[in-house]
Amino acid sequence: NTTFKVFLGYACLVIMAGIGVTMSRGGWLATGISIMAFLVMLLGHRKYRIQAGVALLCLLIGGFLVFDRSEGLKERLNQTLERDSSAPVSVRSLIWESTVDMWKDHRWVGVGPGQFDHAFQYYRHSEVQERPGWVHNDFLQLLAEYGVIGFGLIGLGLALLAAGAWKTRKYVLREARDFGKNRHSNRAACVLGCSISLLAISVHSLFDFNLYIPANGLLAVALAGILVSQLRFTTERHWWKSNLFNRVFASALILLIAFFMSAPLSARFQEAGLLRKANEAEPFSSIRMNALVQAAQVKPSNFETPYQVGEILMQMGRQFEPGYEEELEVAIQWFEKSLETWSDYSYPYAMIGRCLDSLGRIEEATPYFEKALLLDPNNIFVVAYM
């Protein structure tokens, strides 16, 4: 269908333009490598060799012309290629250095799944003062959290996926001489499209936390599943006929998983709504306070919510208006609730110290300040409170 092909061509141009204006260097690199890999693979197929060559030439010329006429693109790229000693240090590279130090202390099993954010304060670089949340390199975060053993197991799975895709490739690619029943098959497009898409996600994951975004993670898993399913065309061994028992068992298993996930997902949904309401309210308003308190009741395991409640009460108490002592005492209780969930969080210790200091209990405050400094020695905010 010629019309549909023209539509797809224009859609690709719009997508390319959208990626260009994101000003994401990682996005540009991932797009460039994936398109080059796609065209190189087509160059090896005699039926599409001419079209792939023309497309490659057009993209190279078009990319050069766009880059040559865009000062914004030049400036963005020069930030990477021409960084000198006077330029600001890349925060991302400092996070990577801290992550490598983290891995060196936990080489084999890592710090634990999802524990990077908690462990980062022990390895913080003095020029990185905020919580990064993620490493901004999925593979490095995988190594730090799961260690060599976990990284090796997951790497083995990825290697098997790549090997399966390569094995499937020669069975699904249609030659020009194929005039049989598979002439209009989309198997080759499916294998090639999923493979190139996963390549793009992998390249971008070197510079960001792609797979920690649920939508991206689900997309990657779906693409991998579709790619694996194409193995059935390589040999009859991969065909499996399901009977009634297997279908009933699989359905029951899915329903059981959905049942056990419904309660935590419902709580997460309620918490997200309350936190959104709190973020939209004025910083020290009663609306924000009530929303945060309700969110803490819905999901007590979130250490950040009680900390935020305590911070609001502390700021109100430090106005030193009548009744401020009670506000500071309640703030201390909320900070302690935060520590019940994450006992090594440095900020609640520092805030408890501030509350006690404001109450004139300086001797009681000192151990809390020292504990905060011990947990997060390179945090200038913690140091300032000392």
Model-derived regions, located:
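TM-adjacent membrane-interface loops and short helices in multi-pass inner/ER membrane proteins
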Residues: 78, 91-142, 146-153
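A membrane-periplasm/extracellular boundary helix in multi-pass inner-membrane enzymes
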Residues: 1-2, 13-31, 38-105, 113, ...
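Membrane-embedded alpha-helical segments of integral membrane proteins
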Residues: 16-33, 185-237
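Hydrophobic transmembrane alpha-helices and their immediate junctions
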Residues: 148-189, 360
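Structural signal for the C-terminal ends of transmembrane alpha-helices
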Residues: 1, 36-46, 67, 162-170, ...
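A juxtamembrane structural motif centered on a specific transmembrane helix
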Residues: 5, 175-188, 223-266
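Lipid-exposed faces of alpha-helical membrane segments in multi-pass integral membrane proteins
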Residues: 6-17, 29-40, 57-60, 149-162, ...
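C-terminal luminal/periplasmic domains and tails of membrane-associated envelope-modifying transferases
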Residues: 275-386
